[in-house]
UniProtKB/Swiss-Prot annotation:
Keywords: Cell wall, Cell wall biogenesis/degradation, Disulfide bond, Glycoprotein, Membrane, Secreted, Signal. The lineage of its organism: Eukaryota, Viridiplantae, Streptophyta, Embryophyta, Tracheophyta. It comes from Arabidopsis thaliana. Belongs to the expansin family. Expansin B subfamily. Residues 65-173 form the Expansin-like EG45 domain. Residues 1-29 form the signal peptide. It is a peripheral membrane protein. This is Putative expansin-B2. Disulfide bonds join 68-97, 100-168, 105-111. CDD domains: DPBB_EXPB_N. InterPro entries: Expan_Lol_pI, Expansin/allergen_DPBB_dom, Expansin_CBD, Expansin_CBD_sf, LolPI, RlpA-like_DPBB, RlpA-like_sf. The gene is EXPB2.
Length: 273
């Protein structure tokens, strides 16, 4: 008799539960496995925490090119002053030059909470308070603010931000090579810029004019500058093969350095990642 009463009690409770779900249109009452816990987390779940400061002119581009070697190009499109010096974990002894990151601030009233994209163009060797630190240009730091409150945000000076690495996408740009002003036929160095995708360079190789010539590995000189010293004069035109640091993808800029190349000249390829 007791078992019968209990069974009827549970049948009644199940019926009431089903009716409640129908009335409230709670379809997940019947399929709890469809509930995705990730959907209940914040949109910041794929972001990481970093420290940030800014340097240089309040509306400037940090320093003149900095430790990557880009020179005054950082003030012009496509960089457009939206650049940053990186602490050791971002600069990576120069291998981090050209990497693109989205950064945003959410902790201050002047923060827009909207991400902006910056490129690593300089080094901040003393930025070691946090494991990851962006020393942004004044322009980039202010770009994280609500419109009209960039000065207010810069006055904070030091700020905790959120960041994530993103692919670089220099619209309309191809990989560009600037021959170092000190280069000659036996000691050739080149600055590499506007690399899409990873942005970071893992390897540069050079091939001389003849089809039979082999690819020669260049070494990183400093920042985004790579060099090759040879005993016999290089025979131009020269082709350059660029391998990205993270993905390992490769592009070849065939005959990008012409036979009559000049130190300091800029040569644009017709390739990019």
């Amino acid at each position: 008799m007791t078992i019968l009463v209990v069974d009827r009690y549970y049948m009644l409770m199940n019926l009431l539960f089903a009716l409640t779900c129908l009335l409230l249109n709670l379809t997940h009452c019947f399929s709890p496995k469809k509930f995705n816990i990730s959907a209940a987390t914040t949109s910041d779940s794929d972001w990481s925490i970093a420290g940030s400061t800014w340097y240089g002119n309040p509306t400037g581009y940090g320093s003149d090119g900095g430790a990557c070697g880009y020179g005054n190009a950082v003030a012009q499109p496509p960089f457009s002053k939206m650049v940053s010096a990186g602490g050791p974990s971002l600069f990576k002894s120069g291998k981090g030059c050209g990497a693109c990151y989205q950064v945003k601030c959410t902790s201050k009233s002047a923060c827009s909470k909207n991400p902006v994209t910056v490129v690593i163009t300089d080094e901040c060797p003393g930025c070691v308070k946090e494991s990851v630190h962006f020393d942004l240009s004044g322009t980039a730091f202010g770009a994280m603010a609500i419109s009209g409150q960039d000065s207010q945000l810069r006055n904070v000076g030091e700020l905790q931000i959120l960041y994530k690495k993103v692919e670089c996408n220099y619209i309309g740009k191809t990989v560009t090579f600037q021959v170092d002003k000190g280069s000659n036929a036996n000691s050739f160095a080149v600055l590499v810029a506007y690399v899409n995708g990873d942005g970071e360079i893992g390897r540069i190789e050079l091939k001389q004019a003849l089809d039979s010539d082999k690819w020669l590995s260049m070494s990183q000189s400093w920042g985004a500058v790579w060099k090759l010293d040879v005993s016999s004069p290089l025979r131009a035109p020269l082709s350059l093969r660029v391998t990205s640091l993270e993905s390992g993808k490769t592009v070849v800029a065939s005959n990008v350095i012409p036979a009559n190349w000049q130190p300091g000249a800029i040569y644009k390829s017709n390739v990019n990642f």
